[in-house]
From Swiss-Prot:
It comes from Herminiimonas arsenicoxydans. This is Small ribosomal subunit protein uS14. The keyword rRNA-binding applies. One of its GO terms (biological process) is translation. Belongs to the universal ribosomal protein uS14 family. InterPro entries: Ribosomal_uS14, Ribosomal_uS14_bac/plastid. It holds the Pfam family Ribosomal_S14. One of its GO terms (molecular function) is structural constituent of ribosome. Part of the 30S ribosomal subunit. Contacts proteins S3 and S10. One of its GO terms (cellular component) is small ribosomal subunit. Binds 16S rRNA, required for the assembly of 30S particles and may also be responsible for determining the conformation of the 16S rRNA at the A site. Keywords: Ribonucleoprotein, Ribosomal protein, RNA-binding, rRNA-binding.
Length: 101
């Protein structure tokens, strides 16, 4: 089980990403628009840099929803590999069966 502080930190990051997503998209559109003047693009870049660091989606880390484990997490299920296997063996994930060939 990951420390509760790490899980809370990730939740805080997810909230910040949602909060600033629109603002970041607007500023990035201005920066990428070559029809704008250099000054406008530069100001947009400064405003983007002034936003909180944790509002960038690349700062997020996928964690297991049950344990908070940061590595070996399956995006589709939101679970770590260990908990995914346990849930699959108990039949809690519809349509998932153990592979055999």
């Amino acid at each position: 089980m990951a420390k509760l502080a790490l899980i809370n930190r990730e939740q805080k990051r997810a909230d910040l990403v949602k909060k600033y997503a629109g603002k970041r998209a607007e500023l990035k559109a201005i920066i990428d628009d070559h029809s704008k003047s250099e000054e406008e693009r530069y100001e947009a870049r400064l405003k983007l840099q002034a936003l909180p660091r944790n509002s960038a989606p690349t700062r997020q880390r996928n964690r297991c929803a049950l344990t908070g484990r940061p590595r070996g997490t399956f995006r589709k299920f939101g679970l770590g590999r260990i908990k995914l296997r346990e849930c699959a063996m108990r039949g809690e994930i519809p349509g998932m069966t153990k592979a055999s060939w």
